[in-house]
Amino acid sequence: MNTQQLAKLRTIVPEMRRVRHIHFVGIGGAGMGGIAEVLANEGYQISGSDLAPNSVTQHLTALGAQIYFHHRPENVLDASVVVVSTAISADNPEIVAAREARIPVIRRAEMLAELMRYRHGIAVAGTHGKTTTTAMLSSIYAEAGLDPTFVNGGLVKAAGTHARLGSSRYLIAEADESDASFLHLQPMVAIVTNIEADHMDTYQGDFENLKQTFINFLHNLPFYGRAVMCIDDPVVRELLPRVGRHITTYGFSDDADVQIASYRQEGPQGHFTLRRQDKPLIEVTLNAPGRHNALNAAAAVAVATEEGIEDEDILRALVGFQGTGRRFDFLGNFPLAPVNGKEGSAMLVDDYGHHPTEVDATIKAARAGWPDKRIVMLFQPHRYTRTRDLYDDFANVLSQVDVLLMLDVYAAGEPPIPGADSRALCRTIRNRGKLDPILVPDSESAPEMLAQILNGEDLILVQGAGNIGKIARKLAEHKLQPQLKDEEHHG
């Protein structure tokens, strides 16, 4: 660290002057990499380990971080603190070595909490919509000249990164409930987009436990803080009397403090009116499709309005919103070989949604924006436990598309569960008589199988949270042609 950076750090976090070197185990994850980037730009020495390089590790290396693609005890011995992701087991050799050397080992949310401690923290929580809402808020604050620090779980396209160190007191961060680690955060403002049964292994399978954890998170707000909550969500509405903090509600509901009205979608843009208490109506053009994104925008507007940001800045940010990586991510429009003498093209969209509610929202946005296109989905279920727990919901939602291709379940380290795999899910959907799903044996087969069924004006949704995003990028790179298989065999 240079003298100027050290002086800045002593002003923001005086006690952290003892920390020089921060090591991240599992640094290639978006959440871990984002925090590492902010700390690197604050002047800390950053190192980390992961199993393989990716865009996150490449970006951090360019910032001066030392990245190891193995887990070894010697990687941590010079560290002041070791930050560990949820995916890392306690017997990881770097964790064992750090504990033996009496180096503090903390979770990523604890480090995020330290970044937030001396700033005006805005935490975005909820089962769905966190990443996009965080990006919208960051865009609005940047448009208003407030230069926020942000830490997001997905790529913020306008910034070209998951995280950025700003010069102001504002820190906008995605708050992760998957391991309950968001309880470490003590923000000034907290958004709750919705609450559904997901990551239930963390909550002992008890939905009441999950709901109480969200209440505990909101109780981390100071008495002068504010909770911004989606009143359209039945669970959020149920919890309102238990929050005990100042609340602003938002949604399509008539009793919302920030109400969405007259929503319509034209292609990739949503158009709607926002009614706010004691404020003029604003007519919003949002450069993101779907009613779910209108809700995300309403949450961001509620926070920005409370902060006193001008409507003109809010509206400019939303109409110019560039989106986030793998959230209805438009990868291109590609010409197809003529069918029956008619020219056609296929629109390729990559989406991270892996819960039935998220998949449903993506399908609805595609139908609303491109009603004349045939919806072709390549889907990869994520985790056997989620597939088992939400099996009927998945079968119902996936039956809405016109053509369905399905990869096997992305296990994320879980053992297979009989009856909760892709073959069973395809069979269930087929037996309902609406659709005849195509089981894709492996990722290498996907481009060729897609090419065989595309005709005319198709909209291809590549959907899921596993490694399916790599397939989407390969499809775009080769303009939907089935060259992936040969390239991978010979590359």
UniProtKB/Swiss-Prot annotation:
Enzyme Commission no: 6.3.2.8
Organism domain of life: Bacteria
InterPro entries the record matches: Mur-like_cat_sf (IPR036565), Mur_ligase_C (IPR004101), Mur_ligase_C_dom_sf (IPR036615), Mur_ligase_cen (IPR013221), Mur_ligase_N (IPR000713), MurCDEF_pg_biosynth (IPR050061), UDP-N-AcMur_Ala_ligase_MurC (IPR005758)
Alphabetic keyword roster: ATP-binding, Cell cycle, Cell division, Cell shape, Cell wall biogenesis/degradation, Cytoplasm, Ligase, Nucleotide-binding, Peptidoglycan synthesis
Pathway: Cell wall biogenesis; peptidoglycan biosynthesis
Annotated GO MF terms: ATP binding; UDP-N-acetylmuramate-L-alanine ligase activity
Recorded catalytic activity of this chain's protein: UDP-N-acetyl-alpha-D-muramate + L-alanine + ATP = UDP-N-acetyl-alpha-D-muramoyl-L-alanine + ADP + phosphate + H(+)
Gene Ontology annotations of biological process type: cell division; cell wall organization; peptidoglycan biosynthetic process; regulation of cell shape
Transmembrane stretches, start-end: none
UniProt GO cellular component terms: cytoplasm
Localisation: Cytoplasm
Binding-site residues for ATP, renumbered to this chain: G126, T127, H128, G129, K130, T131, T132
Keyword Cell cycle applies: yes
Record flagged with keyword Cell cycle: yes
NCBIfam families found in the cross-reference section: murC (TIGR01082)
HAMAP family associated with the record: MurC
Chain's role: Cell wall formation.
Similarity comment: family membership: Belongs to the MurCDEF family.
Protein name, UniProt field: UDP-N-acetylmuramate--L-alanine ligase
Species of origin: Yersinia pestis
Gene of this entry: murC
